[in-house]
A protein has these predicted regions:
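N-terminal Rossmann-like NAD(P)+-binding subdomain of aldehyde/semialdehyde dehydrogenases
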Residues: 1-116, 492-501, 518-526
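Residue-level signal for inorganic ion chemistry
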Residues: 42, 87, 149, 180, ...
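Structural signal for hydrophobic packing residues in well-ordered secondary-structure cores
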Residues: 50-53, 57, 68, 91-98, ...
């Protein structure tokens, strides 16, 4: 076993754009050999990938430290360990995921055709990763593509070049080179990739770039999964546990120095508890980083000067009052966690996703007002985080939309590796993780198989059409409504109970069994020898 280190690898280099069409052709041709479809092939790739990642763990830890200042602990928690567990989960469950499903909600007259759902791979796919979690957000979708039987090209983010070159090495050493390739680069290389025809594009990043990718994909009717972001609100009522709210929201916002698409972008807090909430935020900050964030080994850096400048400009443009933090250092890309009390929803800190350790607090006096404000700022954020009583949090969830939600926590839903994760509206489309990653790169193919003996029942579909056939057709296909002309339910209590207990399919079979039993009891001849 040889452990890989960063110094063992060549420097980051862009892929020549002239090489990109041949790379695309290579993975497309491989898919059409159908060799990526069998379970054995997929498992072989996943297992080889797992051990290559294990051997490259030191290099991956080094890379995330160099690119983002991440501690080894945080990198393992959110990157390396995450992907290793993802592969193990897929390996253990892949055979089950691949199995055909019996189609649900099929009428009795169609059951003889044995309708089922096959899980077919979509084809050759493109995965475009992001810099903030360069390993998880690149390799997570790739694991889904491999599991689904697709071939793939990965384009990691050029803003995390060290992680990108480690991933390229791992993939080249462990996966089938005819099926899985890496393209390095920035805008020119991404443009060249988008010039190719893919069977699916998976993109993680900003909404601005997501629109460009969606537009290019639409030209060839290529399906996309877009994992974007948004101005995610946390809503803290007067009944919330402020110590817990402060600790959980601060952790969510300081992870990766706030460069997390799903962390809260701002806090709507009941005006009566703002001073105490700020005090609890300060207390939690002191507990997390006793010597301060600048000296803390557990607090990273902003990824590059361009992003640091953007954050600094946001902070400079706010009309709010800085209550905590505010210290910065461009030379080291340090940006202190900064709590700002803002006066209204038009403040600069609430106009755009900060994607950094800025924590604006907007006071409210009425929960309905807070919900209205959150919807006005961004109607479809990636996440929403209500803190309060059950009644209050249920009210918030019932009157807002978001990709996901964590009640009384900061993005816990996004911390569960097997829970489907995705946006809604302009925070994204599609979902992945766990089984959803397999489904993301699979086509649910409906299949029937019509036996010859059923032809006499199918004569209703063949001309000439007669009144007799019409009566037969109605008898075979018409569904009786369970409501009257006034919209009232016509189901009796017993039927409602049976449906809730057995389900529609179960009730059908129960009725058939009862009819059969009655027939046998009444002396039906089954043609069986005694």
């Amino acid at each position: 076993m040889i452990h890989l280190s960063l110094s063992d690898l060549p420097a980051f280099a862009h892929t020549p754009t002239a090489d990109i069409p041949p790379v695309h052709s290579r993975v497309v041709q491989k898919f059409h050999t159908h060799t990526t479809r069998p379970l054995a092939y997929r498992l072989e790739q996943l297992r080889s990938f797992y051990w290559a990642l294990k051997d490259a763990e030191p290099a991956l830890l080094e890379a995330c430290k160099a690119d983002l200042g991440k501690s080894a602990y945080e990198t393992y928690l959110t990157e390396v360990g995450w992907i290793l567990n993802d592969i193990v989960f897929m390996s253990k469950n892949l055979e089950r995921f691949m199995k055909d499903e019996n189609a649900e909600d099929v009428g009795l007259t169609n059951m003889a055709m044995r309708p089922k759902i096959r899980k077919d791979p979509l084809g050759a796919v493109l995965v475009i990763g992001a810099y903030n979690f360069p390993i998880q957000l690149s390799l997570g979708p790739l694991v889904g593509a491999i599991s689904a039987g697709c071939t793939a090209v990965l384009k990691p983010s050029e803003n995390a070049p060290n992680a990108a070159r480690v991933m390229q090495h791992i993939i080249s050493q462990s996966l089938d080179p005819e099926a899985y390739q890496v393209v390095q680069g920035a805008v020119p290389e991404t443009t060249a990739l988008l010039d190719c025809k893919w069977d699916k594009i998976f993109y993680t990043g900003s909404a601005t770039v997501g629109k460009i990718i969606a537009k290019r994909a639409a030209e060839t009717l290529t399906p996309v999964t877009l994992e974007l972001g948004g101005r995610n609100p946390a809503i803290v009522t007067a009944n919330a546990d402020l110590r817990l709210a402060a600790r959980r929201l601060l952790w969510a916002k300081l992870l990766n120095v706030g460069q997390v698409c799903v962390s809260q972008n701002y806090i709507l807090a009941d005006a009566s508890i703002v001073p105490e909430l700020v005090l609890q935020l300060q207390t939690a900050l002191n507990e997390f980083h006793p010597a301060g964030t600048r000296a803390s080994a557990d607090y990273g850096k902003v990824v590059n000067e361009r992003q640091w400048d953007r954050l600094a400009a946001l902070l400079d443009s706010t009309s709010g009052e800085i209550l905590l933090g505010g210290k910065t250092d461009r030379d080291t890309l340090f940006f202190e966690p900064t709590v700002v009390r803002v006066g209204d929803a038009d403040d600069a800190l609430l106009k755009d996703e900060s994607f950094g350790p800025l924590i604006p607090i907007l006071p409210f006096t009425d929960l309905d007002q807070a919900i209205h404000t959150a919807n006005a700022i961004h109607a479809t954020p990636l996440g929403i985080y209500p803190f309060g009583t059950r009644r209050e949090t249920d009210l918030i969830l019932s009157q807002t939309r978001s990709g996901g939600a964590s009640v009384n926590d900061g993005f816990f839903h996004a911390s569960i590796p097997t829970l489907a994760f995705g946006g809604v509206g302009d925070s994204g489309q599609g979902a992945y993780r766990g089984r959803a990653s397999f489904e993301c790169f699979s086509h649910r193919r409906s299949v029937t198989s019509t036996p010859g003996w059923i032809e006499s029942l199918l004569d209703v579909r063949y001309p000439p059409y007669t009144e007799k056939k019409m009566r037969k057709l109605r008898g075979m296909t018409d569904l009786k409504p369970d409501f009257d002309r006034q919209g009232r339910s016509t189901r009796g209590p017993i039927v409602r109970w049976l449906l809730s207990f057995l389900g529609a399919r179960g009730l059908w079979w129960a009725i058939l069994a009862a009819v059969f039993a009655m027939g046998v009891r009444n002396g039906w001849s089954l043609g069986l020898k005694r």
